[in-house]
Amino acid sequence: MATAKKITIHDVALAAGVSVSTVSLVLSGKGRISTATGERVNAAIEELGFVRNRQASALRGGQSGVIGLIVRDLSAPFYAELTAGLTEALEAQGRMVFLLHGGKDGEQLAQRFSLLLNQGVDGVVIAGAAGSSDDLRRMAEEKAIPVIFASRASYLDDVDTVRPDNMQAAQLLTEHLIRNGHQRIAWLGGQSSSLTRAERVGGYCATLLKFGLPFHSDWVLECTSSQKQAAEAITALLRHNPTISAVVCYNETIAMGAWFGLLKAGRQSGESGVDRYFEQQVSLAAFTDATPTTLDDIPVTWASTPARELGITLADRMMQKITHEETHSRNLIIPARLIAAK
């Protein structure tokens, strides 16, 4: 059986009626090419089914057009949304994303990182599990490849980082509750080993102190991201502290579980803090990585830092690095937006 002829750049040039160098300029996105010529070349590429050899392009032009992305856990909504935002933004710039899984504990991170560098990517984004950031940065510097970290907390120094402002988000939620009349506000969720939780609890505590409200350590409860455990935890919390009128929840899962727990206990969730004790109502507030339009219609006030927007910011930052618009490291902190309960 005859083998299909491989379409070359010469075939594209002949079909478009231009020189090979013109086709090369269109493929690389460099040089001054008229719109009409570019459209003619791209039409020929599509008609012939020409597949660009990115490795050869890298040798000719110094860039592959590929950005590596190592994700800690693709099953987590945060990283899935971040990946979607990053990919969409980079593809709009004519780039492709090479996606790899680094492991929840970063056990495969170094091996995956080396693989991307050896593949000749233009840059690498690492989302989560960045404990060995110094080693990775040195490896990237040796090959003059930019690396940017996407983090949920501020534990990285002297590297390019894009992360949410956890303290500001906690301050937004807590102050909103206080201004709605709440004075007895508890915290539910997260593990003490989590840096993200530490920053959020710090913002919560700082806001209580700012308004002269007491901090009760026994009102700050750990809880895994389980609706069942959250429901049980809030039920026990309110049984021992019935005058608590509001609870700040670590994430969407905790908030949903807390809401179910309130319903099961015969209590209600709402917004205002006035006369909450007598009405047996409790206001819920929580952090979310989702976009406002995807939030469930339950009575919860949200501090939203959409992971998809973090991905878009990462893409913009990476383009600045690989086009040399900006070379020094930056820590980009994305503020949260408040979405009041309906």
From Swiss-Prot:
Residues 7-61 form the HTH lacI-type domain. One of its GO terms (biological process) is regulation of DNA-templated transcription. GO terms for molecular function: DNA-binding transcription factor activity; DNA-binding transcription repressor activity; transcription cis-regulatory region binding. SUPFAM superfamilies: lambda repressor-like DNA-binding domains, Periplasmic binding protein-like I. One of its GO terms (cellular component) is protein-DNA complex. Repressor for the malX and malY genes. Also regulates its own expression. Binds maltose as an inducer. The keyword Transcription applies. Keywords: DNA-binding, Repressor, Transcription, Transcription regulation. This is Maltose regulon regulatory protein MalI. Transmembrane segments: none annotated. It comes from the Bacteria.
